[in-house]
Amino acid sequence: MTENLGSFCLVLHSHLPWVLGHGVWPHGMDWVNEAAAETYIPLLMELYKLVDDGYHPKLTIGITPVLCEMLRHPRFINGFVGYLDEKFNVAVNDYNDFTENRYEEGRIKLTKWWQEFYSRVKENFIQRYNKNIVGAFKKLQDMNLIDIITSGATHGYSPLLSKDTSIDAQFKTAVDSYKRHFGRPPTGVWLPECAYRPGYRWKNPITGEEYERPGVEYFIAKNGLKYFFIDTALLLGGKSQGVYAARFPLLAELWKQFESQYKEIPTSFEKSQYEPYLVSTTPSTPGPVGFFTRDEKTGIVVWSGEHGYPGCAEYLDFHKKNWPGGLKYWKVTSPKLDLGKKMLYWPDDVPGKLDENAGHYLNLIKEILKDYKNKNGKKGIIVAPYDAELFGHWWFEGNWWIARVLRWIEDDPEIDLTNSRIFLEN
């Protein structure tokens, strides 16, 4: 009899700042257009294909209020169709140019490949999703497959908001926006930048006034939210895998100052990122809230362009683009290779590499869950959060990889595929 090892929960966090009315390129409308064309719609296409094939693609997806409002705005909806037509025409112009100048046959074929890509995205956007990306995700949630979570209304960094009323307003407004778009209150929340602050006695640096400030969990519970997500270092200690201190000397100095004043608080029990926990709140809130912890082992093999799957030679290179038009015709070849030496992209080489990477990921999940169960005598859960825009935008083939992972996990009796809401309810 096959032994069940535990659960796996994929979490995709999607967020963009408000760009409508701020021009087109490079940080205006094209920002959300690219994300919709390369990430959100291709992800929906893969999820609905799984449903059509009889699968149950369970995962957690965060759509921030700002992004949600943008995707429902008429300016985006009308402009997005024009964007897709424009990209299609770029591929047509490239075909004519490459043919006239007798470029290699593979590069000419790729222009047709791009035409087919943007045609499929447009067809699904208009015909299957009725120009409503948010509604297409809502339908999957109504089918009890995905769990859509919210975030701070303006993606405000909660620990640095000086007034508690501002923190409260972030979550209250987010819940109100969510109800309007999804017809129900959210159960979970993605803290912007995973930034959490516990309760403490705060001293005003100007007036010297002191008073008790509740932790972020208080405002989460107050607004009816039941769980959030944290980075591994917040639970287990140690340094998080950030890069900003290395880039900004002043930030590094501030970090040194913090380290000199920091004292580790001992805990009375061993903690693990492979199980959720509850954080107590005040009696005035509905009850404690739960939190899940990011697993770094499954994280680094995906988000790292140098050590992870996106850096494989066969995948489409993100940086090298054809001018004019900006379409991509080259593969990674090697992550650190000069752009001038990148080789032509061959779509036929991709499925085999995707199978290899998805198989490796599945085995990694099993190894982690099996090790945890052997050591602790109980089943754990791997929570794997990523920026949604990594898949499709940065890693073009990423959504195809996600589909393989979800399909193969559901076929595997050793792993339970779940989302955060279902797991906590059970």
Report each predicted region and the residues it spans:
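Trp/Phe/Arg-rich N-terminal binding region typifying the photolyase-homology
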Residues: 3-108, 127-131, 135, 164, ...
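A structural motif corresponding to the C-terminal end of an alpha-helix
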Residues: 43-58, 130-146, 180-184, 219, ...
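Active-site cores of enzymes that catalyze phosphoryl transfer or operate on phosphate-rich substrates
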Residues: 3-7, 12-16, 85-167, 237-379, ...
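Extended, regular secondary-structure scaffolds
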Residues: 170-171, 177-178, 187-188, 194, ...
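An acidic- and aromatic-residue-enriched active-site/binding cleft used to recognize and process polar
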Residues: 13-17, 62-68, 153-156, 163, ...
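Extended hydrophobic/aromatic segments used for targeting, binding, or gating
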Residues: 170, 218, 397-426
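CE4/NodB-like, metal-dependent polysaccharide N-deacetylase domain
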Residues: 167-195, 366-376, 380-383
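A short acidic (Asp/Glu
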Residues: 19-23, 70-75, 159-163, 194-218, ...
